[in-house]
């Protein structure tokens, strides 16, 4: 293992062993953020996780590899999408590039002048011998890093073999809510703005090119893209760039069209590397990452982590909730 990869793994591995790692990509002491602080470093691999995607098999092209053992496949859906991204005979890289070339604007793209970036995620993450679960709403003032977080946690689930189920997202509404106010500098984006519009440069920021020959490199790139999308707002151009980063991941495969556990449909892409299987669900119109999960094999197999990215946009103040 190279010294550079050893450094990356030193940053990320402890996140799996803390009971609070899963949940709060903000300033919670055990959460993960995207600056050189300890919380920042841990998010890079804490936001991918279990069975958020379903129905990945019926529309999968025949030439693709078999579906991963991680998700429970229960339902298949056909998604209205850009014809270029789902045309016959395309490689996974060509599909992602075609989608990047045709991503559409979202309502949030028209509100970037508002002072607060708003994100809501639900996450499932491996701790030492359990899965932690949390619903996070975060408002971050872009000019100074102040803001607010509201977190709801469900009881930890013993063991590592849990796969998020359709009834779980609604359970968060019954959980007690904790509100944390952050002063200036308390919250950080995953990467500093403005993000580069060049995919190779963005990829190097997410996973150093020095690691390109390491078995973990595809996994690190995928984790980085999901962490980026989970913790800061990506506008139309930035979404296109992030899709081009995914398109360049070695060995990425296309699994067809599927739905996540809250019923949203998208295009499913899989990365198998370094003893893990990751799946990303991508909106076929906006290019937004809707959900992601990662499943580990090896000595302690099971769920690594999972994320549903439910709401994103911009608000005039904290506490304002946006609906998808």
Which residues fall in each region the model found?
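Intrinsically disordered, low-complexity prosegments and terminal tails associated
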Residues: 56-324
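Secretory targeting and sorting signals
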Residues: 1-19, 34-60, 246
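A general, composition-driven signal for non-globular sequence regions
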Residues: 21-23, 30-36, 40-41, 51, ...
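Residue-level marker of intrinsically disordered, low-complexity segments enriched
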Residues: 2, 6, 22, 30-31, ...
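Intrinsically disordered, low-complexity peptide-like regions
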Residues: 11, 24-28, 55, 281, ...
């Amino acid at each position: 293992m190279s010294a550079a990869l050893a450094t990356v793994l030193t940053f990320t591995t402890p996140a799996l062993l803390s009971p609070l790692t899963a949940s709060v990509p903000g300033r919670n002491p055990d959460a993960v953020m995207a600056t050189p602080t300890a919380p920042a470093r841990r998010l890079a691999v804490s936001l991918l996780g279990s069975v958020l995607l379903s129905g990945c098999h019926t529309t999968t092209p025949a030439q693709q590899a078999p579906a991963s053992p991680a998700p429970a496949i229960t339902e298949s859906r056909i998604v209205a999408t850009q014809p270029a991204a789902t045309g016959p005979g395309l490689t996974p890289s060509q599909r992602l590039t075609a989608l990047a070339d045709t991503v559409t604007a979202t309502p949030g793209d028209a509100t970037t002048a508002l002072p607060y970036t708003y994100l809501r995620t639900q996450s499932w993450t491996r701790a030492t011998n359990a899965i932690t679960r949390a619903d996070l709403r975060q408002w971050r003032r872009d000019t100074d890093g102040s803001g607010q977080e509201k977190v709801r946690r469900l009881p930890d689930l013993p063991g590592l073999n849990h796969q998020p189920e359709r009834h779980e997202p609604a359970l968060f509404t019954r959980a007690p809510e904790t509100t944390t106010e952050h002063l200036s500098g308390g919250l950080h984006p995953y990467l500093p703005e403005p993000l580069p519009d060049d995919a190779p440069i963005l990829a190097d920021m997410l996973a150093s090119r020095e690691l390109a020959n390491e078995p973990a490199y595809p996994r690190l790139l995928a984790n980085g893209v999901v962490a980026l999308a989970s913790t800061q707002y990506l506008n139309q151009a930035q979404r296109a760039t992030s899709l081009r980063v995914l398109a360049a991941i070695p060995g990425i495969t296309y699994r067809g069209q599927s739905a996540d556990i809250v019923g949203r449909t998208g295009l499913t892409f899989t990365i198998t590397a370094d003893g893990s299987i990751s799946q990303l669900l991508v909106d076929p119109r906006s290019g937004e990452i809707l959900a992601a999960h990662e499943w580990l094999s090896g000595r302690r197999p099971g769920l690594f982590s999972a994320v549903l990215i439910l709401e994103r946009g911009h608000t005039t103040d904290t506490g304002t909730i946006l609906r998808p």
